[in-house]
Amino acid sequence: MALSSPVSPSLAKTNPASSTLDEGQRGSYWITTFGCQMNKADSERMAGILETMGYQEANAELDADLVLYNTCTIRDNAEQKVYSYLGRQAIRKRTNPNLTLVVAGCVAQQEGESLLRRVPELDLVMGPQHANRLETLLTQVQAGQQVVATEDHHILEDLTTARRDSSTCAWVNVIYGCNERCTYCVVPSVRGKEQSRLPESILLEMEGLAARGFKEITLLGQNIDAYGRDLPGITAEGRRQHTLTDLLHQVHDVEGIERLRFATSHPRYFTERLIDACADLPKVCEHFHIPFQSGDNELLKAMARGYTVERYRRIIDRIRKRMPDAAISADVIVAFPGETDAQYRRTLALIEEIGFDQVNTAAYSPRPNTPAADWNNQLSEEVKVARLQEINALVESTAKERNARYAGRIEQVLAEGMNPKDPSQLMGRTRTNRLTFFSAESPQGITHRAGDLVDVRIDQVRSFSLTGTPVIN
């Protein structure tokens, strides 16, 4: 199928939704986002495109003239949730043919034209590489055709004006795609090969965000510490000219940006040079998300992760040597095919040994077009549930223990907005990424707002959040 072409004649049909795209009659839109930060950033860009086209955000999904699902296929339950949502909208479209129905993201990339067979009410199916092309693709829908855009595509530089969900913190994509071949992971097949943005483009976007009042930037990539591998240039020292370390130095001094973060990191590429830069650059926050996936070397080899438990330990040791208070978060998979009880226990032991601040846990989920899905040593659902429950309990207790050391301390918190459960409180995050709630008004009568950097004395700790009182230092 040609890039972003109308579907084959057997599926083609006149598209009543085209009438909602006439100039000056754009109507309203609704975007539901599933999955990772990359998807959230893509959704913000697509929302910006829609608003540039003249759409306005709807008050509710059922009120929208255009509904877009930005989907995730990392696990089966996320994918099935998408089909549940689509089923409801398909019913709605049968009585409202002018509704425009779009599926974007990783499920769209994985399923392609077959999505139209399963949900013939769809107008547009588009993979994540095509997020910046939404206006062009909707123009094709306007011409009266169902459109599929899932071919490999050079991602346009991020020049779209995103509609940011926050007025304080922003995501900036710096590298798209992934060249790894982890045996359980569908991401490379749905997000394509690595494509790094040019540093000048990233810097320009960050300067624009600073001018709009944003205070914190998270640099995003599926495999961010591989940034620059696809860009040309070798230094006099014989290393790559473009690395994440170099990028941090290049963007660090953007005036108005107070904090820098980055995610997600791969242990294979997390270097001492990167750690030293994070320790030396004052705007880089002391929080690192570095998935380890398993505490057993045989399983790491089966996963094709490309590192050992010993290397992972050395990375964490180096981080804590340079930044003793640094927070470490991670991802882990339990019940990977063939995982023995002893191997699983090694994962539990590593969590206790490292003392993670947060761990995202998941039971292994077979995904299409991945080697591990075809192996004959799959574990039962009963084992998956039992191991997931046990590891979740350990993760929560470890997180609470790590949080306990904050009691009584004064932490700098970037206020991000109002606590939705208590309008008298603001919520924000410490440099170590602790979610923190505090009174919008200090005892001295100072009223704080989103965007303020506030010194907060921590009065109460929970497993995954802190509560405190603003203070004047």
From Swiss-Prot:
It catalyses: N(6)-dimethylallyladenosine(37) in tRNA + (sulfur carrier)-SH + AH2 + 2 S-adenosyl-L-methionine = 2-methylsulfanyl-N(6)-dimethylallyladenosine(37) in tRNA + (sulfur carrier)-H + 5'-deoxyadenosine + L-methionine + A + S-adenosyl-L-homocysteine + 2 H(+). Residues 1-23 are annotated as: Disordered. Its cofactor is [4Fe-4S] cluster. Binds 2 [4Fe-4S] clusters. One cluster is coordinated with 3 cysteines and an exchangeable S-adenosyl-L-methionine. InterPro entries: Elp3/MiaA/NifB-like_rSAM, Methylthiotransferase, Methylthiotransferase_CS, Methylthiotransferase_N, Methylthiotransferase_N_sf, MiaB_methiolase, rSAM, rSAM_horseshoe. It comes from the Bacteria. This is tRNA-2-methylthio-N(6)-dimethylallyladenosine synthase. SUPFAM superfamilies: Radical SAM enzymes (SSF102114). It comes from Synechococcus sp. (strain CC9311). [4Fe-4S] cluster 1 binds at C36, C72, C106. [4Fe-4S] cluster 2 binds at C178, C182, C185. Residues 1-22 have a biased composition (Polar residues). HAMAP family: tRNA_metthiotr_MiaB. Its EC number is 2.8.4.3. Residues 404-472 form the TRAM domain. Monomer. Keywords: 4Fe-4S, Cytoplasm, Iron, Iron-sulfur, Metal-binding, S-adenosyl-L-methionine, Transferase, tRNA processing. Its main location: cytoplasm.
